[in-house]
Regions:
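C-terminal outer-membrane/trafficking sorting elements
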Residues: 16, 614-625, 629-702
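Extended extracellular/luminal ectodomain segments enriched in beta-structured repeat modules
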Residues: 417-424, 531-538
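Residue-level detector of functionally pivotal "anchor" positions at catalytic/ligand-binding pockets or at interdomain
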Residues: 364-386, 493-502, 506, 510, ...
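Cys-His-centered catalytic/binding microenvironment captured across papain-like cysteine peptidases
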Residues: 23-54, 59-61, 77, 84-163, ...
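Active-site-adjacent substructure of cysteine-protease-like catalytic cores
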Residues: 53-73, 273, 277-338
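Short, surface-exposed beta-strand/strand-loop-strand elements in extracellular ectodomains
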Residues: 431-450, 543-563
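Active-site-adjacent structural segments surrounding the nucleophilic cysteine of cysteine proteases
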Residues: 88-89, 94-264, 330
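Short beta-strand-plus-loop segments that form exposed binding edges in beta-rich domains
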Residues: 473-481, 585-594
Length: 702
């Protein structure tokens, strides 16, 4: 009976394989939830029950070819719409799947899946026993099963989620039609630079290279370029980062990037040679094509590299030239793709034919293997390095694969050049020999300041926050058995100006607020100048230093709602007068280059006002002479009522050079102001009483 049962089961299996059909949404949902749960690492396991899937997204232009299921707590799974193909095409434990802003490489990869699935459906192919078994194991899955979670795997190696768009492309050719006003950096450059950042190698390039592009002749002397990885970040954030833009641009020039505002392209074989010739990577580095390997042989090649801690540059389906990174795997079929699209859609994807009997739509795949540094690596740390950016990353110097050495005594001073708050260290990796090797963190610029933490062992430390704007890190080793540490340092830029500030004085000084530091990116600051009873306002720049054309200081006439003038660059312009008593200064910056900022002075003209126009109703009369004045300035005041009057002489910068108070006078009063020691030029006499205010322009000349 036992043998008969086995035979019947086998026949049923063959029958099922012979009549493979479409998969309905409910079955696909059950498969998606089971698969995600079965592959979920312990770090993502928040509960033993199956995750909750949201409504399916149907993929396919004329018919459903696959389903995409997003999950309430993050992650997504792509499921075949035919059970003649392998059940799961791709998955991620984070993020969501939509059709919005998909990386071009992902779109091309999904097109490859669609071609395969259409071929399988059109030819009515049967599922293999292995494919049928995969579907059955997922439809019958129970949450307590853990076998699939024990699969051979390598967690994603790359800490970065870089991009080829805005800010990453800041040094690429200028083109207003491209992201951030520049052409795309290119997926080839991004895939190269993410692995370069992973190794933090080289510190300096080799040789030089130039070529003629659609944007003129582009040239880089790599031998004069220094790459400062400690001032790069895992993701660029809202501010520009010269170091991150530099490495992408240099990779682009090295491969003769065909720059364009809607997408930049290059050849993968150029990437391989450039990495060896200009960036010093191993002579064993090479571009391999999937078509030259068996399915198993290709998977083994990729896994061998990843097991060694060597991420891969990968190019995908067809002739589109799409490049990205493969940096991990689960099992022998699913490899982790970092698309180079700010982390969007990163996940595990199936590499091979979805049905062995189908046509081959996986052509064009290739990988740069043995992508590891030359023989002069690792560098290890030495001395004390000062870091001037307000955010970045620090690694002990041994790299992601090797251990550090004994006898190290090195440090990092985090001293941002900008005004910052909330300076914080966040650890991503930590492995030191307990009690033998130590990382000390001091709350200030050197080891004489209070010790915030003395770290050793393998437990990942909690975040460490400075009380001020400086941190000093000291790394001391006696052993060589640890793999070291990697951390990010981050801080918040001080707010120099924001919102709207109102100025009601007759004269004053307005600035971007940054003082001796550079202003911030993405600033929008408004300054309303509305002195009481003013009929004109004159603005004079004391200094001006902004990114030309992009970071602008604009002056508006609020009475007419019109733009009077706009300024940028570093040349001091002529004074500008707004012919009304209401003006606004607007400072607006983009997200790229910053500079020293600006300061301007304003002085307003006003008419005398009182309780009534006549002197006998309590008004204040003012006469000023001689004009021009050389040694003395005579101010005649008159009032029928007791008056306290403040008389001030103000220069064009808004600085008060003379103050004179006449208290409680009635009738006539003369104020003599000595001006012989003052420089020649225009000044403003400002006077104010309880019911009367005004200014007179005064010329001092000799």
């Amino acid at each position: 009976m036992k043998r008969r049962f086995t035979l019947l089961l086998s026949l049923a299996f063959i029958f099922a394989a012979s009549f493979a059909g479409n998969v309905d949404e409910n079955t696909a949902r059950r498969v998606a939830t089971a698969f995600l749960h079965s592959r979920m690492p312990d770090a993502h396991m928040v509960a033993p029950e199956l995750p909750e899937a949201l409504p399916a997204i149907h993929i396919g232009s004329e018919r459903t070819l696959m389903y995409a299921f997003n999950f309430e707590k993050g992650g997504y799974v792509l499921v075949s719409a035919t059970d003649a193909a392998i059940p799961v095409l791709g998955y991620s434990f984070d993020g969501i799947f939509t059709f919005d802003n998909q990386p071009p490489a992902l779109s091309a990869w999904l097109t490859g899946y669609e071609l395969q699935l259409s071929d399988i459906m059109d030819r009515n192919l049967a599922a293999t026993p292995e494919i049928s078994a995969s579907w059955k194991s997922l439809t019958d899955y129970q949450p307590g099963e853990t076998a699939q979670r024990d699969l051979r795997s390598v967690e994603p190696l790359l800490p970065s989620t870089w991009d080829q768009g805005s800010r990453y492309n800041a040094l690429c050719p200028v083109d207003g039609a491209g992201p951030g006003g520049h052409v795309y950096a290119g997926c080839v450059a991004t895939a190269m630079s993410q692995v370069i950042y992973y190794w933090r190698y080289p510190l300096q390039g080799t040789g030089s290279h130039g070529y003629y592009s659609d944007y003129g002749y582009l040239f880089v002397d790599f031998s004069q370029a220094g790459y400062d990885y400690d001032q790069m970040r895992n993701a660029i954030g809202p501010e520009s980062n010269y170091e991150m833009a530099e490495i992408q641009y240099h990779c682009g020039v090295a491969v003769d990037m065909m720059y364009a505002p809607d997408g930049s392209g290059a050849y993968s074989f150029d990437a391989a040679s450039a990495l060896r010739e200009h960036f010093g990577y191993s002579n064993q580095l090479s571009l391999q094509q999937k078509d030259n390997y068996s399915q198993t042989g290709w998977a083994d090649l990729l896994m061998q590299n990843l097991d060694n801690g060597w991420p891969l540059y990968y190019n995908g389906f067809g002739s589109g030239g799409h490049a990205f990174n493969v940096d991990g795997y689960q099992g022998t079929d699913y490899f982790h793709f970092n698309w180079g699209w700010s982390g969007s859609y990163n996940g595990y994807f199936y590499l091979n034919n979805l049905n062995p009997g189908g046509n081959n739509f996986t052509y064009g795949q290739g990988a740069i293997v043995n992508f590891y540094p030359g023989s002069n690596y690792p560098y290890y740390c030495n001395g004390v390095k000062t870091l001037g950016r307000h955010n970045g990353t620090i690694e002990d110097g041994s790299g992601p694969v090797e251990n550090y050495t004994a006898g190290l005594n090195c440090g990092w001073l985090i001293a941002p050049s900008d005004s910052v708050t909330n300076l914080t260290l966040t650890f991503e990796k930590f492995n030191l020999t307990d009690g033998l090797d130590v990382l000390n963190v001091y709350d200030g610029p050197d080891a004489s300041y209070p010790l915030l933490a003395s770290l050793t062992g393998t437990a990942l430390p909690q975040a460490i926050k400075a009380t001020g704007d400086r941190l000093f890190l000291e790394f001391l080793t006696e052993g060589d058995a640890g793999s070291g540490f990697r951390l990010s340092y981050n801080s918040d830029l001080a707010v120099f100006c924001s919102g709207t500030t109102i100025y009601s004085d007759f004269s004053g000084v307005i600035s971007d607020g940054s003082g001796t530091r550079d202003y911030n990116n993405n600033s929008v600051c408004k300054f309303r100048v509305e002195p009481e009873n003013a009929n004109s306002i004159t603005f004079t720049f004391n200094y001006l230093d902004t990114e030309p054309d992009y970071d602008q200081v604009k002056i508006y006439n609020l009475a007419s709602q019109s733009l009077v003038a706009s300024f940028s660059g570093n040349e001091i312009p002529e004074s500008v007068t707004v012919p009304s008593g209401k003006a606004m200064v607007l400072f607006n910056t983009n997200n790229d280059i910053t500079a020293g900022g600006w300061e301007l002075s304003y002085v307003s003209e006003a008419t005398t006002v009182g309780v009534a126009a006549a002197v006998n109703s309590g008004g204040l009369g003012v006469q000023v002479y001689p004009v021009p004045a050389s040694d003395w300035l005579r101010v005649e005041l008159s009032s029928r009522l007791p008056a306290d009057v403040l008389v001030s002489l103000v220069d064009l910068s808004g600085r008060v050079v003379v103050n004179n108070i006449r208290a409680g006078f009635t009738g006539q009063e003369t104020v003599l102001i000595p001006v012989s020691d003052l420089a020649e030029g225009i000044y403003y006499l400002k006077y104010a009483a309880e019911n009367s205010v005004g200014t007179h322009k005064v010329l001092i000349s000799r």
